[in-house]
C-alpha cells in the first residue's frame, strides 16, 4: 500500500474541522498525486521525495491538513498539464498552481519554508526547466505566426531568452542545500524581478491600441495578443513564485517579500490592462465582437479563465433563452417589431411594443438566433445591403446567428457571425427600419434588452 507507513491516516478518516479540513480528502489527493507522479514522464524523484516529506508534516502537524488539501488539489489538476508537452496546457497548469498558492497562503511568502513549500517548489521544477523555455517560445511564436508585428517581433527574442536563462538559473540554484549570502547576491543579479517587463509592456501597448480599433484584423490581433499577454504574465509569476521560495530557503525573507510584492503589483497591473474587456464602451465594440460570444472561442474561454485569476470583474449579465424586448437607446420609446412589406418581412422600430416579443435562443456554438414571436416564425437576418430581413428558414445561417456585446452602461450592441463589425441599428426614417452599420452606429445601435 502506498501509504503503509502512515496507517493512522486511514484510521481517522472521519476527523474533520473547518480549520483542518477532511483527512479523507487529503488521503485521496495524496494517493492521486503520488500515482500521477509515478506515471508521469521525466525525472520526478525530487517531487516524490518532497511528497513523502509532506505526508510526514501532515502526521505531525494536523493543522496543515487544510492547507495541504488545497495545494494538493491545485497540483493534482496541474500535473497532467505540466507533463502534456502542450504549451497552452502547461501554462494552464502553472495557473492552477499559482492560483492555489494565492488562495491558500496569500502568496508564496506566506507558505514559509516547510514541507508544503518544498513540495510546491519540486512541482514547479517539472516545468521551470526546458518546459518553461519551450512553452514561452511556443506561445510567442504561435501568436506572431498569425500576426506580423515588427516591433513585437524585435522584443520577442529577448523575452524568450530571458525566460530560458532565468528558469535554467533557478533550477541550478535550487540544487544547493545551503544558500549563502553570496549565493543570494548571485541570484538577485541573474534573475531580477523586472525581467520580461519590456515584452509584456509592448503587448500592453498593442492591446490598448486594439481596444479602440475600427479594423477587424487589428481587433483579432489584439485578442490573440491578450491571450499571449495573460500567458506570459502567469509564466512570469510562476518563475517568481519559485524564486520567492528559493529566497525563503536562504532566510532572505525581506527579499522574498519584495519579490512577492512585485508579483502582487504586476497582477494588479494585469487586471487594469484587461478590465476594459468586461466594461466595454461603444468605441470598443469591435474587439468585443471578436471576444464574444466567449463560449464560441477557445481563445476567449482561456482569456476569461485568466481574468478571473487576475481579479477582473465578471462579464455583465448574459443573455438567456427567452423572450426579450429590444428598446432603442436613441429613440427610447421604440422597440423592435416586424411588418410585411411588398411580399417581404422587415424588422423596424415600433412605439406600441409593450411586452417582450423577440425570442432569443442560444445555439450550441454560443451564438444566438432572434425570432419574432408575435406572428409567424421569422428570424432576424442581416441582408447583404444591411437590411434586417425576416426569414422563414429554420436555420437563418450565419447572417442570422447573432452575438451580443455588453456595454458598461447596461446596453448591448448586436452583430452577426458573418459580419462581426456590422452592428444592428434603427435608421433615421419615418419607417425606422432595422439595418446594419459598420463599426459603432452611436446610440441608434445601442439596445436595452429587457
From Swiss-Prot:
Signal peptide limits: 1-18
Nucleus among the record's keywords? Answer: no
Disulfide bridges in this chain: none
Please list the tissues where expression of this protein has been recorded. Answer: It is suggested that CrTX-B is synthesized in the tentacle, is modified (become CrTX-A) and then migrates to the nematocyst.
Alphabetical GO CC annotations of the entry are:
extracellular region; membrane; nematocyst; other organism cell membrane
Q: Where in the cell is it found?
A: Secreted; Nematocyst; Target cell membrane
Q: Recite the UniProt keywords alphabetically.
A: Cytolysis, Disulfide bond, Hemolysis, Ion transport, Membrane, Nematocyst, Secreted, Signal, Target cell membrane, Target membrane, Toxin, Transmembrane, Transport
Per the record's keyword annotation, is Transcription regulation included, yes or no?
Answer: no
Task: Please list the GO biological process terms of this entry.
Answer: killing of cells of another organism; monoatomic ion transport
Provide the GO MF annotations for this entry: toxin activity
Miscellaneous comment in the UniProt entry for this protein: CrTX-A and CrTX-B are encoded by the same gene. However, they differ by their molecular masses (43 and 46 kDa, respectively). In addition, CrTX-A is primarily localized in nematocysts, whereas CrTX-B is only detected in the tentacle without nematocyst.
The entry assigns this protein to a family as follows: Belongs to the jellyfish toxin family. Type II subfamily.
- What function is annotated for this protein? Has potent hemolytic activity. Is lethal to mice and crayfish. Causes cutaneous inflammation in humans. May act as a pore-forming toxin, disrupting normal transmembrane ion concentration gradients in susceptible cells.
Which protein is depicted?
Answer: Toxin CrTX-A
Which species is listed as the source? Carybdea rastonii
